[in-house]
Structures are given as C-alpha cells and as structure tokens.
Swiss-Prot record:
InterPro entries: Glyco_trans_51 (IPR001264), Lysozyme-like_dom_sf (IPR023346), PBP_transglycosylase (IPR036950), Pep_trsgly (IPR011812). It is an enzyme of class 2 (transferase). It comes from Neisseria meningitidis serogroup A / serotype 4A (strain DSM 15465 / Z2491). Pfam families: Transgly. It is found in: Cell inner membrane. One of its GO terms (cellular component) is plasma membrane. The chain crosses the membrane at residues 8-28. This is Biosynthetic peptidoglycan transglycosylase. It is a single-pass membrane protein. PANTHER family: BIOSYNTHETIC PEPTIDOGLYCAN TRANSGLYCOSYLASE (PTHR30400:SF0), MONOFUNCTIONAL BIOSYNTHETIC PEPTIDOGLYCAN TRANSGLYCOSYLASE (PTHR30400). Peptidoglycan polymerase that catalyzes glycan chain elongation from lipid-linked precursors.
Length: 233
C-alpha cells in the first residue's frame, strides 16, 4: 500500500519535472531559433479539423527589425503597457484578475502579460484552471530569466493568432492588407491589434462595433507605448 502511495506521488512529480526540463530546453533553443510551430497552433489546427473546417496554417516567421514599429507600439499599448519594465508579471493586473475570478467563482480573467501570453502560446493550451496558470507562471519566469525582452517580443509577434489559421505579424499583414509587416500604418496596426483578444470572434464579425471602438482606443494609446530598450527599429 505504501509503495502504491509513493508511486502516486512520484509519478505526477516526475511528469512535472520532465515537462519543465523539456520546456527549459526549448526556451534556450528559441533564443536563437524560430519555433517550427507552437503548441497553441497545433491545438487550434486540430480543433479546426475536428470541426470539419478546411483551414490551412499560415505562419511566416519575420525578424523583429522587419516588423513595423507601429504594430509593436499598438500591441504594447493594448496588451501590456508595462512590458518594457516588468519581470514577466503585472502584479496589479494579477490582483485585479484574482478578485474578478473570486467574484465569478471561475477562472475567467487572467491578468496576463505579453510574456505570459507567449508562454501559453509556445507550450500550453487554451484551458483555464489554477494549475494551468501556475504552469504558465513557471514557464514565464524561466523565459524571462534567460531571454532578452526584444526576443520575447519577437517570439510573441510571430505567434499571435489573428484569424482562422493565420498566425504571426507577417501572415496577418499579408492576409488583411496584402503588404509586409514592415509597412503597416498606425491605423492598420491598431486594427490588427484590436482583434488579438478574440481573433476568431472578429473573423466571424468583421464589422463589429466593439472592433471599431477597440481600434480607436489603441490608436489613442499608441503614442505613450514604451518599447524594450534594446529595440533599435
């Protein structure tokens, strides 16, 4: 009986250690190498297949300096205004999210920074639980410890979902505007950024009033967006 209990404890601990060792190895690799495909991309494409949707993956890696500063500022203004200065976590946002989750009785609000969103995109799935949020936090801490801010942002820019099967700034720019990501205007960048929280909803509701309102909010905030110090774009 004691041996069974020991195995029941050791097995999940071993899986946790193995998974985090795998993640850490990939984080080190991604400091210099572009991901072939993220966990979120694989999950999403499998979902489309199960739903009977004929969707092809459009994912085109683009170096950081060849992505418009307008898009960088728009995303920081909308998703994580303190990105350049924090260590991966916005503690004020996390506290607000905890209060909202407690009031609702469910894990809804995440208070996620760009770094946390990237951790989810690279290695996790879309499920919402305190265990998954804990794993996301562990991955975020590892990533922030060994990866420059501009590289984190570069990985994020190239892994964001923007439409059915459309991932990354370059693919989105080509899909929506038929131009490279380097040439995005402020208006175009704001429109793309407004889609980020719910890309598939806005894919189905392209004339949504919420999308227009969000675009205008992003445009107003872009001027004060602070990029990472190493950004020389």
């Amino acid at each position: 009986m004691f041996r069974i209990i020991k195995w029941l404890i050791a097995l999940p601990v071993g899986i946790f250690i193995f998974f985090n060792a795998y993640v850490y190895g990939n984080i080190i690799t991604y400091r210099a190498v572009a991901p072939h495909r993220t966990a979120f991309m694989s999950m999403r494409m499998k979902q489309f297949e199960q739903e009977g949707r004929d969707v092809a993956l459009d994912y085109r890696w683009m170096p950081y300096k060849r992505i418009s500063t307008n898009l960088k500022k728009a995303l920081i203004a909308s998703e994580d205004a303190r990105f350049a200065g924090h260590g991966g976590f916005d503690w004020g946002g996390i506290q607000n999210a905890i209060r909202r989750n407690r009031n609702s009785g469910k894990v809804k609000a995440g208070g996620s920074t760009i770094s946390q969103q990237l951790a989810k995109n690279l290695f996790l799935n879309e499920s919402r639980s305190y265990i998954r949020k804990g794993e996301e936090a562990a991955i975020t801490a590892m990533m922030e410890a060994v990866t420059d801010k501009d590289r984190i942002f570069e990985l994020y820019l190239n892994s964001i979902e923007w439409h059915y099967g459309v991932f990354g700034a370059e693919a989105a720019s080509r899909y929506f505007y038929q131009i490279p990501a380097a040439k995005l205007t402020k208006q175009q960048a704001a429109k793309l950024t407004a889609r980020v929280p719910a890309p598939l909803y806005y894919a189905d509701h392209p004339k949504s009033k919420r999308l227009r309102n969000k675009t205008n909010i992003v445009l107003r905030r872009m001027g004060s967006a602070e990029l990472p110090e190493s950004d020389t774009d």
